[in-house]
Amino acid sequence: MITPEKLLEAAKQLEPQLQEWRRTLHRHPEVGFDLPQTKALVKKALTEMGYAPQDCGKCGVLALAGGKKPGKVILLRGDMDALPLQEESGEEFASELPGKMHGCGHDMHTAMVLGAAKLLKEHEDEIEGTVKLEFQPAEEIFQGSLDMINSGLLENPKVDAAVMFHVLAGMPLPAGMVLVPGGGITMASCEQYHIVVHGKGGHGSMPNACIDPITAAAHIHIALQEINSRELDPAGFGVFTTGRFEAGKASNVIPDSADMWGTIRTIDPEQKVSAQIHQRMTEIAQGVATAYRCTAEVTFSDYCPCMVVDKPLAQNALTYMTELLGRGALDMTAITGGKPGGGSEDFAFVSHEVPTVSMFLSAGNAKEGYLYGQHHPKVRFDDSVLYKGSAAYTYMALRWLADHKE
């Protein structure tokens, strides 16, 4: 098998191509399941490498490397979708599409897995089994992973282990460092809520003839904060945030309704905290609405479970990343103390089906000029780390398959 040094050297030679892929994707961000240009770029690149890419689900792409020798199957995932965000990064290759931006680094992930595909194809005879390459849409809306699972992602051939990386910007870590978690729950579950308050609209000069849904919705929003501060166990992790509030179109019109949308995050595999939040949020919204002569509807959607990292696979990953990067690999528990984070990731659906490890790659810190974190309109990512990401994906696959021959 290729040595770590040779693999890093080969990956480094791909750097111009990796940056070209990434910057092309960055200029043309697409969101959700609507990724025609992104998907076309991925399939074209894979075909030129000698793969036969296959569609999976609404907009996913799969390709297989290896398979010439018997062995297990490892899945490498890169997500492809962008955010509905107006870019303010100042990059020369900034988004050319108003209101859309690769503000979470998925363009980086796609390029990294394409780089891994190139390296694996060049060393296909060394693969002791099969590597399944996954390019996933709709991670930002927590729907893409489940859609691909339901479309056969983990079958034909059946996946034995799964790996993903996520880049980090604006964190106090040198660019190019890989963080490996220790196992167990590492990320929170996530779901969305939508509260609609119905009143009776009319002229702003005659509130007495109306039933104002904005007033009711404002009081609902304030009342809901009692759940966070007074009802949830402070020793656990459960939080929700209303991030969007809309009502009316004109300043002199009381609207018929007001809407609130938000997110719920919990670290609770049994979903007891989620159930508590659901119950109390519904009771409070409907009760307060009634007090203000309104009615309220509360709905919950897009549930995504906690990310569960397989401990033996994580231990393998730390060993392999240390072999590849030396001190450039770090046990994440040294930073987190083993505590899960409040972020969410829909690859969690895969983690509940097969042993999974979710790692991180630092892509710039404040001292290096990368001041902002993910989902900020000014976030920037250091794409000089792309080759390390491609090498890490490749080495993880080669080493794990070699160590787990059937």
Question: Language-model features: where?
Answer:
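Divalent metal-coordination and catalytic microenvironments
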Residues: L25, L76, H106, L133, ...
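Histidine-centered active-site/metal-ligand motif
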Residues: H26-H28, H102, H106-H109, H166, ...
